[in-house]
């Protein structure tokens, strides 16, 4: 799921997967891990800002959901859940993103200029995921924008 962090993936998700696989006599070689993929990038500062706003709102939406509280807890951010949940019930969707600070954004998303996205993904997840799912908001940059990023990641 996109609502994860490197810390949660390494400390919770992967150990649970490994334990489940071991119970069934399998190993991680028998399983494909698809990494969380919030990405904040864009061709210019304005596009990056739009992308950050969109991803902050998406993080806030997920953080308001009780099912994802564990992801917040591992970082000590569980107190935010109640505020976001109450705001969601009041329909304050746009304002919810304002509660997601830079530290949280950086934990949940790869925030990088286009030519650095692949390197950042590799640094965070290269040793523990087999594939990445990109979840980017803030503008449709099209295939011409994403093709070099994907090619760099595949290289």
Where do the protein language model's features map onto the residues?
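Active-site-adjacent structural elements that line small-molecule/cofactor binding pockets in enzymes
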Residues: 1-155
């Amino acid at each position: 799921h996109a609502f994860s962090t490197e810390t949660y993936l390494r400390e919770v998700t992967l150990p649970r997967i490994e334990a489940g696989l071991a119970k069934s006599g399998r190993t991680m070689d028998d399983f494909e891990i698809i990494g969380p993929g919030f990405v904040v990038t864009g061709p210019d500062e304005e596009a990056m800002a739009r992308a950050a706003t969109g991803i902050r709102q998406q993080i806030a939406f997920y953080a308001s959901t009780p099912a994802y509280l564990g992801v917040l807890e591992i970082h000590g951010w569980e107190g935010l859940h109640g505020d976001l949940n109450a705001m969601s019930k009041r329909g304050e969707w746009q304002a919810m993103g304002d509660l997601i600070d830079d530290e949280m954004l950086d934990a949940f998303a790869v925030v990088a200029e286009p030519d650095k996205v692949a390197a950042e993904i590799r640094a965070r997840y290269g040793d523990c995921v087999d594939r990445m799912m990109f979840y980017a908001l803030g503008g449709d940059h099209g295939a011409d924008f994403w093709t070099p990023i994907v090619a760099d990641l595949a290289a």
